[in-house]
Amino acid sequence: MKQGIHPDFQKVVFMDSATGAKFVAGSTMKPEETIEYEGETYPLVRVEVSSDSHPFYTGKQKFAQADGRIEKFNKKYGLKK
């Protein structure tokens, strides 16, 4: 491999925003936020959907609190249903 062209690989904590579940995985992402997890400090990456909240993996429907693009547009421009 050539030196200096590959991104740094590190362990990060991914946190599901819908359920609050956390898991450690390797990534090249470089988030600004950090978190204390299992006695060590890791960079934190927040995700809207993970295997903990996705209906395919859970087998049941869960409703996430995140607004979609249409709701954000309607809030911004004051449109009502």
Curated annotation (Swiss-Prot):
Q: Which InterPro entries match?
A: Ribosomal_bL28/bL31-like_sf, Ribosomal_bL31, Ribosomal_bL31_B, Ribosomal_bL31_sf
Claim: Ribosomal protein is one of the keywords in the record = yes
The signal sequence is none
**Which one of the record's GO molecular function terms can you name?**
structural constituent of ribosome
According to UniProt, the name of this protein is Large ribosomal subunit protein bL31B
Q: Recite the UniProt keywords alphabetically.
A: Ribonucleoprotein, Ribosomal protein
How is the quaternary structure described?
Part of the 50S ribosomal subunit.
GO cellular component terms given for this protein: ribonucleoprotein complex; ribosome
User: Member of which family?
Assistant: Belongs to the bacterial ribosomal protein bL31 family. Type B subfamily.
One of the Pfam families matching this protein, by short name? Ribosomal_L31
- What processes does the entry annotate via GO biological process terms? translation
Query: By its UniProt entry, which HAMAP family does this protein fall under?
Result: Ribosomal_bL31_2 (MF_00502)
